[in-house]
């Protein structure tokens, strides 16, 4: 008798239906074989399953066991096949048919308990799309899938193998009374250090740049002396970012579930990601990789912020790898037998000093021109060209800082409203256009359709850009930033003031000769 249970294989962020076929025979020497291009981690499931059976007081069949993971031409990796193999083995031993609309997923420990397993969100999404009625996952993974409606599909959180076997025998849902996923049981987000505009004294120009960046998804570079507030400013953008939309939330949850970052909370189902990798981060950690490939920081920042503090300190190879994701909003990772595409539609925020010591242009700077040149060259022209806005940060006057006890910035609520309003305008404008949700996503054809720039404003743009050396890409980035500024002001057309403001974010550069 052949028993087949259902499971999935996760390839990057894609899911593949897997049939777990189990057969027992009394002929030949008793042994346990797994076929279907099983990796080392899948082969090791044999020992985990034997131990789990023993600890659940189940008789392990003293027969020749063959498990086939179909389709057999795909490499199977991970420990998620423990549960479907164990259930198939038990049902084959006891001649129990498993309904075809049930799906199993999870890793077994030696004592029969189910461990947290990456990718449960992708499993439930797959199961819902394919019409599965019952999904069995580790109880420790249920917080990831609180959004799924039980009327469409029942999701059972299983604590141990004995519990699931009891359900197979009785069919009583009360076996899982403590672990059936409840939509109201979302885990709370642990409090994190709060960065807020209300604590920033001065820096109005930088705050305005952050407002524009949040409203239109524009990349932003802060540069200036150390201690001027570049890092705090960048981290404060999280306060004014709008929550994820439903479709964006699903995209982000898939990514974070695949790497196990939804284990302790499901904050990423609503909050936009904010990734802040250290400058020692490796190339693979940044762009993704490994075998099998896993998402890197640029994918973990999808639909959110990637903040590179001290961007000049990152290896040049790592920075150059950002070219394609910044332009195409995805990254391709190729392997011998396959190619993986990970989404990477993020907003880049970066901070840097003008020189190694940070005090270029003052008496405190001891850096030679050669040292400064070598330092600034780490940020190549193509990377700088892909950053929409360049903002110089000055030190705030000490006299103003000394009055910190009387400082009170009440503009934050208005800034949030402005950002939400501008996002709503863009959502309505680009409704039905694939892969475009903000002004920063616009391609050449969309800029022609939606820029709606006044003739007077266009003349100012032509005159200004003829005097400064900019690329074609920079020209259109100025137009897109102008479009966002007009959206923040509630203006249907791009006016002169919007163009003039956008221009100021492109004129300043990391020129070693610039007098800071």
Predicted stretch roles:
Residues 303, 309-310, 321:
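Walker B catalytic acidic pair
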Residues 1-221, 225-231, 474-475, 492-516:
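Peripheral, non-AAA+ core regions of ATP-driven protein-machinery
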Residues 224, 288, 310:
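The Walker A (P-loop) glycine that initiates the GxxxxGKT/S ATP-binding motif of P-loop NTPases
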Residues 35, 41-46, 59-61, 68-78, ...:
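Basic, amphipathic alpha-helical bundle interface domains used for macromolecular binding and assembly
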Residues 221-263, 328:
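Walker A/P-loop
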Residues 110, 306-307, 313-314:
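Residues immediately C-terminal
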Residues 173-212, 216, 243-298:
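P-loop NTPase nucleotide-binding/switch module
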């Amino acid at each position: 008798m052949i028993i087949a249970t259902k499971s999935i294989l996760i390839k990057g962020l894609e899911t593949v239906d897997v049939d777990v076929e189990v057969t027992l025979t009394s002929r030949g020497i008793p042994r346990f074989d797994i076929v279907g291009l099983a990796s080392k981690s899948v082969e090791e499931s044999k020992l985990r399953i034997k131990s789990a059976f023993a600890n659940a007081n189940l008789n392990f069949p003293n027969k020749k066991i063959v498990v086939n993971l179909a389709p057999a031409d795909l490499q199977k990796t991970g420990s998620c096949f423990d549960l479907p193999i164990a259930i198939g083995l038990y049902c084959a031993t006891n001649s129990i048919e498993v309904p075809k609309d049930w799906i199993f997923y999870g890793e077994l420990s030696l004592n029969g308990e189910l461990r947290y397993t990456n990718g449960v969100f992708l499993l439930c999404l797959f199961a819902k799309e394919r019409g599965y009625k019952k999904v069995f996952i580790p109880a420790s993974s249920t917080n990831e899938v609180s959004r799924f409606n039980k009327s469409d599909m029942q999701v059972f959180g299983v604590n141990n193998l004995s519990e699931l076997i009891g359900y197979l025998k009785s069919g009583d849902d009360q076996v899982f009374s403590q672990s059936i996923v409840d939509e109201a049981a979302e885990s709370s987000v642990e409090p994190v250090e709060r960065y807020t505009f209300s604590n920033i004294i001065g820096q109005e120009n930088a705050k305005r740049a952050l407002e524009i960046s949040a409203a239109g998804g524009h990349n932003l570079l802060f540069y200036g002396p150390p201690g001027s507030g570049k890092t705090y400013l960048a981290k404060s953008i999280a306060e004014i970012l709008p929550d994820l939309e439903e479709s964006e939330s699903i995209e982000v949850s898939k990514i974070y579930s695949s790497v196990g970052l939804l284990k302790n909370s499901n904050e990423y189902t609503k909050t936009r990601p904010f990734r802040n990798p250290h400058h020692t981060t490796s190339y693979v950690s940044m762009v993704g990789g490994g075998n099998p490939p896993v998402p890197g920081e640029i994918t973990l920042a999808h639909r959110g912020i990637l903040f590179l503090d001290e961007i000049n300190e990152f290896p040049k190879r790592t920075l150059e790898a950002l070219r394609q994701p910044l332009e195409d909003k995805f990254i391709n990772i190729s392997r011998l037998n396959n190619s993986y595409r990970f989404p990477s539609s993020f907003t880049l925020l970066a901070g840097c000093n003008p020189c190694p010591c940070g005090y270029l242009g003052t008496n405190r700077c001891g850096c030679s021109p050669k040292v400064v040149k070598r330092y600034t060259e780490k940020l190549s022209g193509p990377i700088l060209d892909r950053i929409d806005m360049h903002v110089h940060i000055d030190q705030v006057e000490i006299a103003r800082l000394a009055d910190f006890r009387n400082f009170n910035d009440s503009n934050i609520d208005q800034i949030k409203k402005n950002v939400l309003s501008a996002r709503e305008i863009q959502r309505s404008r680009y409704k039905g256009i694939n892969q475009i949700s903000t002004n920063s996503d616009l391609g050449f054809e969309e800029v022609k359709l939606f820029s709606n720039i006044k003739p007077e404003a266009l003349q100012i743009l032509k005159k200004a850009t003829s005097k400064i050396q900019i690329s074609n890409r920079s020209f259109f980035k100025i137009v897109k930033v102008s479009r966002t500024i007009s959206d923040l002001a509630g203006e249907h057309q791009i006016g002169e003031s919007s163009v003039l403001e956008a221009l100021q974010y492109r004129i300043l550069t990391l020129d070693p000769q610039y007098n800071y």
